[in-house]
UniProtKB/Swiss-Prot annotation:
Family per similarity comment: Belongs to the QueA family.
Protein's name according to its UniProt entry: S-adenosylmethionine:tRNA ribosyltransferase-isomerase
Function: Transfers and isomerizes the ribose moiety from AdoMet to the 7-aminomethyl group of 7-deazaguanine (preQ1-tRNA) to give epoxyqueuosine (oQ-tRNA).
Subcellular localization(s) per the UniProt record: Cytoplasm
Main enzyme class: transferase
Domain of life from the UniProt record: Bacteria
Gene Ontology MF term list: S-adenosylmethionine:tRNA ribosyltransferase-isomerase activity
PANTHER family for the chain: S-ADENOSYLMETHIONINE:TRNA RIBOSYLTRANSFERASE-ISOMERASE
Amino acid sequence: MRVTDFSFELPESLIAHYPQPERSRCRLLSLEGPTGALTHGTFTDLLDKLNPGDLLVFNNTRVIPARLFGRKASGGKIEVLVERMLDDKRILAHIRASKAPKPGTELLLGDDESIHATMTARHGALFEVEFNDPRPVLDILNAIGHMPLPPYIDRPDEDADRELYQTVYSEKPGAVAAPTAGLHFDEPLLAALREKGVEMAFVTLHVGAGTFQPVRVDTIEDHIMHSEYAEVPQEVVDAVLVAKVRGNRVIAVGTTSVRSLESAAQAAKSDLIEPFFGDTQIFIYPGYQYKVIDALITNFHLPESTLIMLVSAFAGYQHTMNAYKTAVEQKYRFFSYGDAMFITYNPQAIFERP
């Protein structure tokens, strides 16, 4: 399969730079996987689409203020984007500079350059940086970091983004990008879903900056997926297995929840799914056999991205590309701060290729 098979024309005007004033008032395009039928509505229509006993699986990662600005002690300006916190003193990061720093280079970070750090080692495209500061890394990032808005949101981050670019149920700091399907859930909607009898479980996947990296090969089978840390605890496994036995659906909120659950299913030795704690490089594209997910809530993704490939593997290539064409025609808002889709599984998708 070719990467260009997953291309589509997207007018710049449809890229959302700010979220809707109310989280749950975004538009919702529903795609019936088996038939390809489309219906238009608003996000709160989920109340009618979900049944008592259905299980929603959320990603409770919390976005850290991962973008830092500063300079090398020798003078050159740098921009640091944290990929992962290694411990209380060290980070793994992308560094943008006119000349890449060498191990031992002193860095002065923050708007006032008050935070001192040292680049200690290089690991491929990533740099290991150690802070010379008594505070834990997370405290330093909260003090001097900027919210790492995606590259297609072409504006500086604002104070409001610290709340808006965060799900209301975020709990475990570590992501450098929000699990954006979850941004549409507010407390009243969550309460209404609980009242209806919809069950909820929480995995953790710390979204890395690699999620925004373009696919740089022509043939998708040649693509090497970036690695991200995921946790699927026993209580999530139990909730999934009980829902399946009851005949209810497992509904992933976002592609990161999909990748967490399917990673746990892939690694399982004896059951459908077992607890999973570790790095995952799972790459889902047409031909993949889904093991756990029955429905998916997700935003609209970039052309030629691994995420539109994941959706195509779930709903079928033709149904997915037709839905995207319709979304553009109907002027849905795209990407992280944009509108959402509700998609049911197409069992025939595994046999379909572009």
